[in-house]
């Protein structure tokens, strides 16, 4: 992308889950704090393998499904997704980014949930990865429309991929994994301003509990590398019957900024739109006001359709000033009206 150098699929996929081989071990692996990131990643690999991502490049036909029909929590409403589960060769994975005129990124997620690599420039890549298998997340921006975003995903050279045809779903009790996810997500929802760190590798984890919270509430996010990677933060749970606003200075991230509402389980909600810097209306002084449930005439209003919610701020190609902020500038400015 030279200019950016500086629910149908899933429904049918669920029926395929039973046909996916469980890993050779006959013993179910108990979930612990120590292996939670692996278990939650295995759950996501399972969901995407059910759609065929270990055998082919899966392109979502439109914006993500709402609710738990989505394969992954906190999918965003600003990009379309393409995905593949691949196997490393000599501890490296190979892929490429075509030349496009929209935001286009690839993230390499290890079996421990780490986004070890995140690249945004077109070209061919052969990059190291710490696990045998890796999940490739392609994000194609919708700033030029959904059809254009989908067409650009169609330009991906799938012959680059060493598809993980031998991948076997790990033998966790996924109902138990879900219980851990719910417990951790409730903890995140109780915090006023939860910021993600997304360490790139296992050795970079300095706070296991923080890392588990990040995997439960926002699996698959990217590390906050200035002007390349992203930074994310979650609000606390907010009431549908209250009008909230946040007025803030434009973060001036390299690619774009977005604000997305989710239900208490961190899934997208029916008929609830997101707001991003490609579409928002600025105030006369250059600041930005985003509103929640304040009426159709409110500035940049997000109507959660009568549902309590949390919201996530995303900074794509994050500005160093946002990286260095003690709190997210959008969430910290929220006020009930």
Model segments located where?
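Bacterial N-terminal signal peptides that target proteins for export
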Residues: 1-10
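Intrinsically disordered, low-complexity peptide-like regions
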Residues: 4, 19, 74-76
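Bacterial N-terminal signal peptides
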Residues: 11-19
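A compositional/structural signature for long, glycine/proline-rich flexible linkers
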Residues: 24-337
């Amino acid at each position: 992308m030279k200019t950016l150098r500086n629910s149908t699929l899933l429904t049918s996929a669920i029926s395929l889950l039973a046909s996916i081989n469980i890993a050779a071990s006959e013993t179910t692996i108990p979930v612990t704090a120590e292996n939670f990131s692996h278990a939650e990643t295995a759950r996501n690999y399972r969901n995407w393998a059910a759609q065929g991502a270990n055998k082919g490049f899966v392109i979502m036909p439109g914006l993500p499904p709402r609710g738990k029909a989505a394969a992954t929590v906190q999918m965003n409403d600003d990009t379309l997704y393409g995905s593949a589960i691949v196997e490393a060769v000599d501890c490296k994975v190979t892929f490429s980014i075509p030349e496009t005129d929209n935001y286009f990124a690839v993230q390499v997620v290890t079996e421990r949930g780490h986004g070890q690599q995140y690249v945004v420039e077109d070209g061919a890549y052969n990059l190291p990865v710490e696990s045998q298998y890796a999940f490739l997340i392609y994000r194609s921006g919708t700033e030029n429309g959904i059809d254009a975003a989908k067409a650009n995903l169609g330009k991906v050279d799938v012959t680059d991929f060493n598809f993980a045809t031998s991948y076997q779903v790990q033998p966790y009790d996924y109902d138990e994994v879900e219980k851990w996810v719910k417990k951790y997500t409730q903890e995140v929802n109780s915090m006023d301003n939860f910021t993600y760190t997304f360490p790139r590798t296992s050795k970079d984890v300095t706070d296991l509990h923080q890392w588990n919270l990040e995997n439960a509430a926002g699996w698959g996010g990217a590390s906050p590398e200035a002007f390349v990677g992203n930074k994310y933060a979650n609000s606390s749970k907010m009431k549908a019957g209250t009008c909230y606003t946040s007025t803030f200075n434009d973060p001036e991230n390299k690619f774009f900024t977005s604000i997305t509402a989710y239900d208490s389980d961190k899934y997208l909600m029916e008929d609830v739109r997101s707001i991003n810097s490609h579409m928002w209306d600025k105030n006369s002084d250059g600041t930005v006001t985003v509103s929640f449930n304040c009426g159709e005439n409110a500035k940049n209003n997000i109507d959660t359709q009568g549902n309590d919610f949390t919201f996530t701020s995303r900074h794509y190609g994050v500005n160093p000033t946002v990286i260095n902020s003690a709190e997210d500038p959008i969430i910290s400015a929220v006020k009930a009206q």
